[in-house]
């Protein structure tokens, strides 16, 4: 069956749900798709359709299982919801780099929890530009003053991590009650249910308060590979978000990082099971590659315009080391420390060869007097980093440092140190 063409009629925005486990991220995602489906702007997706990842689909290109698409009157959205917690933080570092904005879901009944803070911090680190807050489970809160207290707590967290809280819109509702009303009557009209109306109100707020991003269309094409599928009779497909530039079918690209660079031709491009002649920055797409085996390409590589980015292992980075309160280490570390470096969609072990202080949290501590200086939680430092595997990196790129399931630091590449 021939695939329909994707028609670009509205601006495309990538959005995601973030927040503490069990505060209702996936329920809210389901409620949004079903509410917009009632107005013809989406295919309704029930909770279990979002929460269970369909395995590779032999018939077509499946973009990462947690992506759903929907439309409001003004925009086309791709929505990412990553339910599992351990993967969530990992996906936030790789996936949040793809968000143009986020809906922070906080249970009005429970208030902010440790992961609420962690996700706000991560959103800031990876450059999510705007947040709208949804206080969920409002039906379980009898006293409106309690919701106001939760709102104040959330604003404090947003302020602490550099989101101007007085500009952030905070709405309340019940994703579950909205979803139940929509399951009972999929053709519900605005005005029929206060809970469904609160979902419409949320999306109107997202339309207005999460700015349409300025895409880097004039830069050379680059896509970080998120997933790879092999489609019988068609070849190998790499999926991911176009970080910058544009790409047309039949153009030549390079596959860079983790192993030797390979050159190939693009034979097809698809988005949400529709074909494209050209993909542009911001799209979540699948790219069919000529003559590439599934074993030749993996998550963490990049597909780019030939000659525009190179793989490297040695660079200098500027890093903020998280405190224990921010979810980081309790103790400091020395030269020779070997954590994981998360860059785009990949994580690679690296060694900290050297460092110099930019700003210390407690400069009077013995750390500087010691013959073997130590990096302490809360410090800002410049680091010289050696990765064990070459990956596509460039000046100005952000990365996260993780160890044993926790984020240790957040940084930016200052300089590539080898040819």
From Swiss-Prot:
For this protein's source organism, the top of the classification is:
Eukaryota, Viridiplantae, Chlorophyta, core chlorophytes, Chlorophyceae
Per the database record, which ranges form the tr-type G domain? 10-214
In Swiss-Prot or TrEMBL terms, this protein is called Elongation factor Tu, chloroplastic
Gene it is expressed from:
tufA
Task: Tell me which species this is from.
Answer: Stigeoclonium helveticum (Green alga)
Q: Does the keyword DNA-binding apply?
A: no
G4: where is this region?
136-139
Q: Where in the cell is it found?
A: Plastid, Chloroplast
Q: Matching InterPro entries, A to Z?
A: EF-Tu_GTP-bd, EF-Tu_GTPase, EFTu-like_2, EFTU_2, G_TR_CS, P-loop_NTPase, Small_GTP-bd, T_Tr_GTP-bd_dom
Stretches the record annotates as G2: 60-64
Alphabetically, the GO molecular function entries are:
GTP binding; GTPase activity; translation elongation factor activity
Q: Give the top-level enzyme category.
A: hydrolase
- The record's principal subcellular location, in a coarse class, is plastid
Pfam family for this entry, one: GTP_EFTU_D3
GO BP annotations, alphabetical order:
mitochondrial translational elongation
